[in-house]
């Protein structure tokens, strides 16, 4: 048996690297310095956030110097929350080049231009809320009158699309649907559209891909429209968008993939980058776990195994609520 003292006080090798250290608030220090100078040294997920700031700064530098295509993917709950305004900021200032989202990411952006969502509570009785016509997304409330008014707008919008389809003898893709929606917002909504992602994507000609465009309220409205309208032949083509999205990755000199959440937007982006032998940079923000084999929880190294992220890519995954860390990430990079 070994000497217990030798076991406890086992000699260690000399270890070089970044020393763990937090910010000293006795010094004159601001949030920018905390994020850029200290977060990487704190450890745990703070280190990942600090690394993400550095990676995105590299991306931004390369975007200014050479052809760099930045893909941003986000699930609808990001738009349900106040992250919508952050994404709109990035689009407005052309910090991203391609957007991929779910149907909720489109429709909730539009609905917020009609009336705002309201801060609620996680624990209220669902049956009582249903009786009052109040929908709950986490601790965010969306009264149903928003959707009622949304249908009025969408019926008019579908009429425009249907006439366009018939006159041009062309079926619009989902990304063209989103572009036309941005144009419709420009022509029909007030100042609230200035906070909109879809509106600024239209103004800056930044494509929005939404492969599951019917999986949400837009799909509900399409159902009623096609059932009730005499001219119910309105169609949306999702096949052309896969060509357009993949070609944007293939034709790029370098690419970066920034993903909030998981599911369809995440896979659409990284799978497009498979066609160019993987993305050069990747930043994931997620709370999904990898242990169930889901795409949402798949870490960057899993993407490397598929060829969706390059072996030598600069990447990081932050395992955290995006509503907490994404504002700090954007601030650390752009402010």
From Swiss-Prot:
GO cellular component, one term: cytoplasm
Keyword Protein biosynthesis found: no
Cofactor(s) this protein cannot do without: NAD(+)
A family per Pfam: DS
Keyword Glycosyltransferase: no
Superkingdom of origin organism: Archaea
Keywords, alphabetical: Hypusine biosynthesis, NAD, Transferase
E.C. designation(s): 2.5.1.46
Involved pathway(s): Protein modification; eIF5A hypusination
PANTHER family: DEOXYHYPUSINE SYNTHASE
Protein name stated in the entry: Probable deoxyhypusine synthase
Protein source organism: Methanococcus vannielii (strain ATCC 35089 / DSM 1224 / JCM 13029 / OCM 148 / SB)
């Amino acid at each position: 048996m070994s000497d217990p003292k030798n076991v406890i006080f086992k000699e260690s090798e000399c270890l070089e690297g970044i020393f763990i250290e937090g910010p000293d608030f006795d010094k004159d220090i601001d949030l920018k310095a905390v994020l850029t100078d200290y977060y990487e040294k704190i450890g745990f997920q703070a280190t990942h956030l600090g690394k993400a700031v550095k990676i995105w700064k590299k991306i931004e530098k390369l975007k200014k110097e050479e052809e760099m295509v930045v893909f941003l993917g986000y699930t609808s709950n990001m738009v349900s929350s106040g992250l919508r305004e952050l994404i709109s900021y990035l689009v407005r200032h052309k910090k991203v080049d391609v957007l991929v989202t779910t149907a909720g990411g489109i429709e909730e952006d539009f609905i917020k231009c009609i009336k705002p969502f309201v801060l609620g509570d996680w624990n209220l009785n669902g049956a009582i809320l249903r009786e009052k016509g109040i929908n709950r997304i986490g601790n965010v409330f969306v009264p149903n009158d928003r959707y009622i008014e949304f249908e009025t707008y969408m019926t008019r919008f579908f009429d425009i699309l249907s006439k366009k389809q018939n006159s041009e003898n062309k079926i619009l893709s989902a990304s063209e649907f989103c572009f036309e929606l941005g144009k419709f917002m420009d022509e029909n909504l007030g100042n609230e559209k200035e906070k909109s992602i879809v509106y600024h994507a239209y103004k800056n000609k930044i494509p929005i891909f939404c492969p599951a465009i019917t999986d949400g309220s837009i799909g509900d409205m399409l159902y009623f429209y096609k059932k009730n309208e005499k001219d119910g032949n309105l169609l949306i083509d999702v096949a052309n968008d896969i060509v357009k999205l993949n070609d944007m990755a293939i034709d790029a000199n370098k690419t970066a993939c920034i993903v909030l959440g998981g599911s369809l937007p995440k896979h659409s982006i990284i799978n497009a980058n498979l066609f160019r032998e993987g993305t050069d940079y990747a930043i994931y923000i997620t709370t999904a776990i990898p242990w169930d084999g889901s795409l949402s929880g798949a870490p960057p190294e899993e993407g490397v195994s598929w060829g969706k992220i390059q072996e030598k890519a600069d990447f990081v995954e932050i395992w955290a609520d995006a509503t907490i860390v994404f504002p700090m990430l954007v601030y650390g990079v752009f402010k």
